[in-house]
C-alpha cells in the first residue's frame, strides 16, 4: 500500500498549505477579498481531483467546502492534530475498500504497488458496468467475464457488499473512471493478448505423436447438417402458361418448374438431352390432372417465372448495407453453430455443413444425365457419424436420422446417397484440419519415397517393352505415359452412365495418331481425348522408338472404338504399382513429377538479383510448367479482355507519370548545376526517388499483365493445392525473401500451416 501512503502524505501537505494560507489571510484581510474567489476555484479543482481518486476524500472536501461557505475563515484555527486524526480514519477506510482503491489510483496515473500481485481475487472484479465498457468495443469482454467468477470466489463478502454500496452512493465515480480509461486506451492491451489467444488455438498436430494405423480420431462431436430451406410458393401474380393459357401448378410441380425457369437463359436448356431428362423427371412430380394436360415441354412458358427470379437477383444486388449486414450476421450465426466440430478436444472447422438444395443436374461436358432432378435430401436419408460418448445431433422436429454410426476409421461426419449417379456424398472437415493436413503430408512423403526408387522403376518398364507377353508390354507402355505425361490411370465406367472421359488405361485407338516424323521430330504420338471433368487433352509428344513400335503393334487389326490397351485395366496396373513400391499409385507419379518439376523450374528461373515482383513471376512460370504437364486447363475468364484493357490503361497512365517525373528530374539537375546549394541537391534526390518509385510501379503492372496473359487458359490453383509439395514453395520463399502471402492466400496458408512451420530454406523434395 506504498502508493496509498504517498497519496495520503501529499493530501496532508495540501491541508497544511490550506491552513497556512488562512493564517496569512488573518494578517492581510484587505487582500482576502481580492483573492477569495480565486482560491475557491483552486479548492474546487482540488476537490474534483480528489473525487476521481476515492470517495472518502471527496466527502472530506465537500465538508471543507460547506464549512468555508458557512463560517468563512473558521478553518484558520483548526488543530493540526485533528487533521492527522482524520487522515488516520481515511486510511482505515481505504484499507476497507481494498483493491478497489488501488485500481482507481492505477487508472488515474498512479503506479501500482508490488503487493497487488498478492491479491488476485480483487484484480479482475472491479469492472465498470456494461454500458460504460460498450463504447470501448473491447473484443475480449466475454472472455474476461468468463474469468471473473473464479476471482469472485476468493473475494471477502463483506468487502464486496461495502464496495457495491459505495458505488451506488456515488455514481459520479463511474464517469471519471471511463474518462481515465479513455485517456489510457486499454485497447492496445487487448491487441497484445489477442495474438496469444490465436496462437493457443493453433493446433500443431504435426508435433504430436500420430495415431495408430487406421484410427482417425478418438472423440468426435458435431451438430449435424443444415438442410435446404423449404420451398416458398411463387406470388399469385407470377403465372405459368401452357399452350398460351394460365395454369396453376401443384406445389411439387411448381418447385421443379422453377428450377428450369432459373436456367431459362442458360445454354443447358437448349440441349435436347437436358430437356428430355428434365421433362421426364418433372412429370413424376405432377398430379394426374397435370400429367394429362402438360404433354409437351415446347408448349410450356416459363417467362414470368424467369423474370421474377431475375428481379430477385437484382434486388439482392441493390440491398442496403444494413440488409447485407443482417444476412451476414445470420450466416455467421449459422457458421458458429454448425460450422465447427469437436475432435479430440480441439475445435475443427467443417468444410461443407450445408446440404445441397434440390435442383437440376448439369454434369460436366455432354453428360448423359444432365437435366435430371436432384431430389431434396431429408433427415431420413442422413447417416450421422460421431463418438459413442458424444451428444448425437438432434434431427429436425418430426424427423429422424437414417442411421447413427460410431466409426473412427473414417473421416466423414455425415453421409447420404444422391439419386442421380447413386454416389455417396459426405460432409467432411475443412482442408486446414488435422485429418486433411495429415493426409496431404502423407501423400507428399509417399511421393518423396518414389524419388529413391524411380530410376529402378524406369529401368524395369524399359526392359518390359521387350517382353514376350503382350500384357506386360502394354502395362510398361501405359506406365511410361503415366510417368512421362502425368496421365491419370483412368477408371472403367458403365456406358451411358457418365460422360465419355478417359484416362491412360481406357484410351481407345481413336484417341491417338502416330507420326514417324512431325515438325522435325521423330516418333511423335498425337493425343486427343477428353480427360477428367471433360477437359480436352491435346498433345504432340516425341517418344522413344520402342514405345512407338509397340503402339503400332497394339493398334494392328483394331477399329477406332477399340481399346488401345486391351490386355490392361486399372486393377492390373495398380497391383503392379503396389508390387514396385508400397503405396504407389498413378496419382503418386503425378504428385512426384509435379513437385520435382516445380523444384527444378524454380532453380532455373529464379535470379538472385531480381526484385520481389520478378521473383513472383518466375514462381508463376514454374507453376505454369506443372499445370501444363498435368493438363490443368481452363476457359479464359469472360471478363479477361476487359480486365486486360483496364490494366493496359493503368500501364499507359503510369508511363505518362514516369515521363513527367523524368522531365522534372532533368530540370532539377540543371538547376542544381547552376545553383550549387544544399536545397537544390535535396530536390534532385527527391525527384530521383520519385522516378525510382514510378519505375517500380510500372514494372509491377507490366509483370501483372504478362502473368495474366500467360495464365489466361491455365489453372494454376489445382496443381498448387493438390500436386505440389508446399514445403518446396515455403523453402523458396524463405530463401529469396518472398513473403509467403504473395504466393498463398489466407485459406491456403491455413491448409499448409504444417509445411510453413516445418520447412526451412534448405528443404529438398
Swiss-Prot record:
Organism ancestry: Eukaryota, Metazoa, Chordata, Craniata, Vertebrata
Covalent link Glycyl lysine isopeptide (Lys-Gly) (interchain with G-Cter in SUMO2), residues: 101, 103, 117, 134, 148, 153, 158, 164, 172, 204, 336, 549, 642, 700, 712
Highest rank taxon of the organism: Eukaryota
Subcellular location: Nucleus, Nucleolus; Nucleus, Nucleoplasm
Bias-annotated ranges (Basic and acidic residues): 1-23, 40-108, 129-166, 179-199
Modification after translation (UniProt): Sumoylated. Lys-117 is the main site of sumoylation. Sumoylation plays a role in partitioning TOP1 between nucleoli and nucleoplasm. Levels are dramatically increased on camptothecin (CPT) treatment.
The protein's name in its UniProt record: DNA topoisomerase 1
Similarity annotation: Belongs to the type IB topoisomerase family.
Annotated site residue numbers, Interaction with DNA: 316, 364, 412, 443, 501, 532, 574, 632, 650
Chief location bin: nucleus
Disease: A chromosomal aberration involving TOP1 is found in a form of therapy-related myelodysplastic syndrome. Translocation t(11;20)(p15;q11) with NUP98.
Keyword Plastid: no
Annotated positions of the Phosphoserine modification: 2, 10, 57, 112, 506
Consequence when changing residue 103 to R: Localizes in both nucleoplasm and nucleoli. Almost complete loss of sumoylation, concentrates in nucleoli and no clearing from nucleoli on CPT treatment
Stretches for region Disordered: 1-199
Modified residues (N6-acetyllysine): 172, 280
Stretches assigned to the Topo IB-type catalytic domain: 432-765
EC number of the protein: 5.6.2.1
Transmembrane spans: none
Catalytic activities: ATP-independent breakage of single-stranded DNA, followed by passage and rejoining
Bias (Basic residues) ranges: 24-39
Gene: TOP1
Amino acid at each position: 500500500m506504498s502508493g496509498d501512503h504517498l497519496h495520503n502524505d501529499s493530501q496532508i501537505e495540501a491541508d497544511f498549505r490550506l491552513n497556512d494560507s488562512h493564517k496569512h489571510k488573518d494578517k492581510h484581510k484587505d487582500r482576502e477579498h481580492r483573492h477569495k474567489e480565486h482560491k475557491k476555484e483552486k479548492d474546487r479543482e482540488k476537490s474534483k481531483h480528489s473525487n476521481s481518486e476515492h470517495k472518502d476524500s471527496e466527502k472530506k472536501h465537500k465538508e471543507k467546502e460547506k464549512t468555508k461557505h458557512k463560517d468563512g475563515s473558521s478553518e484558520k484555527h483548526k488543530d493540526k492534530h485533528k487533521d492527522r486524526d482524520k487522515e488516520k480514519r481515511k486510511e482505515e477506510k481505504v484499507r476497507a475498500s481494498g483493491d478497489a482503491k488501488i485500481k482507481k489510483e492505477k487508472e488515474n496515473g498512479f503506479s501500482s504497488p508490488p503487493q497487488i500481485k498478492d491479491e488476485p481475487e480483487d484484480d479482475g472484479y472491479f469492472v465498470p458496468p456494461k454500458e460504460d465498457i460498450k463504447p470501448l468495443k473491447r473484443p475480449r469482454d466475454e472472455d474476461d467475464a468468463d474469468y471473473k467468477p473464479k476471482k469472485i470466489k476468493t473475494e471477502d463478502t463483506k468487502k464486496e457488499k461495502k464496495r457495491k454500496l459505495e458505488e451506488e452512493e456515488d455514481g459520479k465515480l463511474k464517469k471519471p473512471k471511463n474518462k481515465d480509461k479513455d485517456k489510457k486506451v486499454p485497447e492496445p492491451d487487448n491487441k497484445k493478448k489477442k495474438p496469444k489467444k490465436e496462437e493457443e488455438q493453433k493446433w500443431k498436430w504435426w508435433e504430436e505423436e500420430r495415431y495408430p494405423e487406421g484410427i482417425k480420431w478418438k472423440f468426435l462431436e458435431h451438430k449435424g447438417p443444415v438442410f435446404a430451406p423449404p420451398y416458398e410458393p411463387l406470388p399469385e401474380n407470377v403465372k405459368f402458361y401452357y399452350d398460351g393459357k394460365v395454369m396453376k401448378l401443384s406445389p411439387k410441380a411448381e418447385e421443379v418448374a422453377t428450377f428450369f425457369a432459373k436456367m431459362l437463359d442458360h445454354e443447358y436448356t437448349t440441349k435436347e438431352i437436358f430437356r428430355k431428362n428434365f421433362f421426364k423427371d418433372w412429370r413424376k412430380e405432377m398430379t394426374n390432372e397435370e400429367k394429362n394436360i402438360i404433354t409437351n415441354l415446347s408448349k410450356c412458358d416459363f417467362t414470368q417465372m424467369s423474370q421474377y427470379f431475375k428481379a430477385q437477383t437484382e434486388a439482392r444486388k441493390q440491398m442496403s448495407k444494413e440488409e447485407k449486414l443482417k444476412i451476414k450476421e445470420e450466416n455467421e450465426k449459422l457458421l458458429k453453430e454448425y460450422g465447427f466440430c469437436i475432435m479430440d478436444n480441439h475445435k475443427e472447422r467443417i468444410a461443407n455443413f450445408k446440404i445441397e438444395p434440390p435442383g437440376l443436374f448439369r454434369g460436366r461436358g455432354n453428360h448423359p444425365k444432365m437435366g435430371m432432378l436432384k431430389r431434396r435430401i431429408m433427415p431420413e436419408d442422413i447417416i450421422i457419424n460421431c463418438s459413442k460418448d458424444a451428444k448425437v445431433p438432434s434431427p429436425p422436429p418430426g424427423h429422424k436420422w437414417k442411421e447413427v454410426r460410431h466409426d473412427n476409421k473414417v473421416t466423414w461426419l455425415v453421409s447420404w446417397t444422391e439419386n442421380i449417379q447413386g454416389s455417396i456424398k459426405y460432409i467432411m472437415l475443412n482442408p486446414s484440419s488435422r485429418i486433411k493436413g495429415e493426409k496431404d503430408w502423407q501423400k507428399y512423403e509417399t511421393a518423396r519415397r518414389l524419388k529413391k526408387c524411380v530410376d529402378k522403376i524406369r529401368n524395369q518398364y524399359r526392359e518390359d517393352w521387350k517382353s514376350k507377353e503382350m500384357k506386360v508390354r502394354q502395362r510398361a507402355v501405359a506406365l511410361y505415359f503415366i510417368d512421362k505425361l502425368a496421365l491419370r490411370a483412368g477408371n472403367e465406367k458403365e456406358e451411358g452412365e457418365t460422360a465419355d472421359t478417359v484416362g491412360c488405361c481406357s484410351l481407345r485407338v481413336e484417341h491417338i495418331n502416330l507420326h514417324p516424323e512431325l515438325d522435325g521430330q521423330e516418333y511423335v504420338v498425337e493425343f486427343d481425348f477428353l480427360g477428367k471433368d471433360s477437359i480436352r487433352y491435346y498433345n504432340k509428344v516425341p517418344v522413344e522408338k520402342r514405345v512407338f513400335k509397340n503402339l503400332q503393334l497394339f493398334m494392328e487389326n483394331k477399329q477406332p472404338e477399340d481399346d488401345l490397351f486391351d490386355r490392361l485395366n486399372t486393377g492390373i496396373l495398380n497391383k503392379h504399382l503396389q508390387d514396385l513400391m508400397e503405396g504407389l499409385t498413378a496419382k503418386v507419379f503425378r504428385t512426384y513429377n509435379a513437385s520435382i518439376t516445380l523444384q527444378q523450374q524454380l532453380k532455373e528461373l529464379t535470379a538472385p538479383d531480381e526484385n520481389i515482383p520478378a521473383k513472383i513471376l518466375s514462381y508463376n512460370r514454374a507453376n505454369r510448367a506443372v499445370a501444363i504437364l498435368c493438363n490443368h486447363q481452363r476457359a479464359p475468364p469472360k471478363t479477361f479482355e476487359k480486365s486486360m484493357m483496364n490494366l493496359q490503361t493503368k500501364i499507359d497512365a503510369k508511363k505518362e507519370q514516369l515521363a513527367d517525373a523524368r522531365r522534372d528530374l532533368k530540370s532539377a539537375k540543371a538547376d542544381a548545376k547552376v545553383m550549387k546549394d544544399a536545397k537544390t541537391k535535396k530536390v534532385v534526390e527527391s525527384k530521383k526517388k520519385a522516378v525510382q518509385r514510378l519505375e517500380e510501379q510500372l514494372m509491377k503492372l507490366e509483370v501483372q499483365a504478362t502473368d495474366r496473359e500467360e495464365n489466361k487458359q491455365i489453372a494454376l490453383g489445382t496443381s498448387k493445392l493438390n500436386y505440389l509439395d508446399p514445403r518446396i514453395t515455403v523453402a523458396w520463399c524463405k530463401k529469396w525473401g518472398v513473403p509467403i502471402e504473395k504466393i498463398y492466400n489466407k485459406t491456403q496458408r491455413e491448409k499448409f500451416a504444417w509445411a510453413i512451420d516445418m520447412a526451412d530454406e534448405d528443404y529438398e523434395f
